Amino acid sequence: MKKLNIALLAGGNSSEREVALASAAMILDAFDRSRYNVIPVDVHGLHWTCKGAGDRKVEVDKTDFSVPVGDGKIRFDYAFIMIHGTPGEDGKLQGYLEMMGIPYSTSGFVSSVETFDKTLCKRIVSEIDGLCLAREVLLRRGDRVDADAIAARLGLPVFVKPNASGSSCGVTKVKSVADMVPAIERAFTESDAVLIEEFIEGRE
């Protein structure tokens, strides 16, 4: 039986890059090598590389999702995405792979786009009858920050978080007005927009 060529896409561009690489290393050990030819691909910005002979980095040809080997090339049959944050969870990789006609391991392009952007996701689910959502303030890079006005509108504490990020990186529970701006600045290191939500006490 012909082995399937699997691209194990790891790394990414977020602050979780090293965690994603470590996760991919564990996944790599779990593949049945008698059935799959697994090639780890480090995705970092526009550079998608895998190890060639002598640990030489080889660039993936993104025009046909292949990797050069000797005088030929290996075309990937499937993509296993092990990237936290962008571009593995926000629809970028999913959109590319769908254009290439390559099946992959995560949710689809549309659902990835709609759920990675927290504000967009809230707009969509707000149409569900009976579903209550936390009140919010959305800030975009360059917006004027009025911490007193935000606290007056939402109360304290509030949660300050990147609007588009793959995990809890950059998330802060803010209990005072004085801590608001530093928390917003921290969230902006992870995303171009920051979502501030009221605190809702309850059981998760």
Which functions belong to the PLM regions below?
Residues L139, V171-S176:
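Short beta-strand-to-turn element immediately C-terminal to the catalytic PLP-Schiff-base lysine
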Residues M1-V110, E114-F116, L120, I124-E127, ...:
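ATP-binding N-terminal substructure of ATP-dependent carboxylate-amine bond-forming enzymes
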Residues I124-C132, R186:
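Basic phosphate/pyrophosphate-binding loop/patch that engages nucleotide-derived ligands
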Residues G101-Y104, L131, P162-C169:
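Acidic/polar active-site rim loop that often engages polyanionic ligands
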Residues K175-E204:
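Phosphate-binding site of ATP-dependent enzymes
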Residues V125, A151-V171, D192-G202:
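ATP-grasp fold ATP-binding core
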